[in-house]
Amino acid sequence: MTRNEKSEVIAKLESEFKDAQAIVVCDYHGLSVKKLEALRNAAREQNVKVQVIKNTLANIALKNSAKDGMSLKDTNIYLWSEDQLAVTKVVVKFEEANSEFFKIKTAYIDGEVASVDKVKALSKMPSRDELIAMLLQVWNAPIQNFTIGLNALKEKKEQSA
């Protein structure tokens, strides 16, 4: 890779990392190409970007986008997105299915380096759409119970008449 190509890669990664709300770094040593493609497909469905990047290039891009502090060693695959929950859900689900070859190493979430435990905890949270559905269900419950009660009262009066 020439110096110009490296500069282009760093500039591209910088701009993408600046927009990313979450960046997760994982070890994928020993993962088959088929499994790696499955990860890429699952990530693509959630608008999560996946890329294997040299650590030196990733370090420069992270530092230039004000997201440094992660210690990067060995072979790494990077996943990032503007949606924190999407990244964590994809990564944790894939790690559970492929724990022998795929491990979460570190992450950058909410402006700070995050532990593996924080990534796993975040993945268990409901998404925005799920939270809205829960809220609507809570708001709808009293009205629904009221109408059920009125219908029961109506049927009782009809039977007694």
Swiss-Prot record:
GO terms for cellular component: large ribosomal subunit. Disulfide bonds: none annotated. Signal peptide: none annotated. One of its GO terms (molecular function) is structural constituent of ribosome. Keywords: Ribonucleoprotein, Ribosomal protein, RNA-binding, rRNA-binding. Pfam families: Ribosomal_L10. PROSITE patterns: RIBOSOMAL_L10. Belongs to the universal ribosomal protein uL10 family. Part of the ribosomal stalk of the 50S ribosomal subunit. The N-terminus interacts with L11 and the large rRNA to form the base of the stalk. The C-terminus forms an elongated spine to which L12 dimers bind in a sequential fashion forming a multimeric L10(L12)X complex. This is Large ribosomal subunit protein uL10. The gene is rplJ.
